[in-house]
Amino acid sequence: MLNKKKKILIAGLGNANVTADSLGPKVVNNLYITRHLQKEGIASYQFELSAIAPGVMAQTGIETSEILESLAERIKPDVVIVIDALAARSYSRLNKTIQISDTGIAPGSGVGNHRNEITQHTIGVPVLAIGVPTVISVPAIIHDVFGEKSLENVSENIDEEFISMHVTPKNIDESMKRISYTISEGINHLLHN
């Protein structure tokens, strides 16, 4: 998908102030951005890379999909790459799996905070999504440990607030540094070497 694409916009989704949700902004902070260098004639690169960490709707009052649609109309990228933290369905994938999709993403859907989807249909250009599961729900943990039958039995006896809770490992700070660096360096190497 990237071999013929020259103008790339990367969007680091998530809340930079919440460690488990800060993957996107952390990746953006480590990228080697080149759009401004090419526009000013300072340097020439195979790819024109621009990036944004748009925050979350609670910070901006604007759907991230609206921000990206407006940016795509203005700077006309050939492809948008979105990077976001995800919710795991299994503890074995927590902070260990990097998922890549060419169908876009629905931010917040893993934790029940459904936002407008970010897809080629909504943005107007192809969308690649890169995500890492950084949180897991209590029901997913119960299912991992005890199986489906126990999940049904336990769910009946647990407070609704507890069932809707998402948790993250205690080493999330270190994991986030490592994962965000791995993704950003992978992108930097792919686009600039």
Predicted segments — roles?
Residues 1-8:
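Extended, charged alpha/beta regions that create polyanion-binding interfaces
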Residues 8, 78-79, 127:
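Conserved acidic residues
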Residues 11, 15-47, 51:
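Glycine-rich phosphate/diphosphate-binding loop of Rossmann-like nucleotide-binding domains
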Residues 13-21, 58, 85-89:
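Gly/Ser/Thr-rich loops at beta-strand to alpha-helix junctions
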Residues 22, 26, 63-67, 75, ...:
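Conserved active-site and cofactor/substrate-binding residues in soluble primary-metabolism enzymes
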Residues 40-42, 68-72, 115-120:
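A generic local secondary-structure boundary/capping motif
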Residues 45-71, 76:
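A structural-propensity feature for long, helix-poor, extended segments
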Residues 52-53, 82-193:
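A structural signal for small-residue-enriched, beta-sheet-centric alpha/beta enzyme cores
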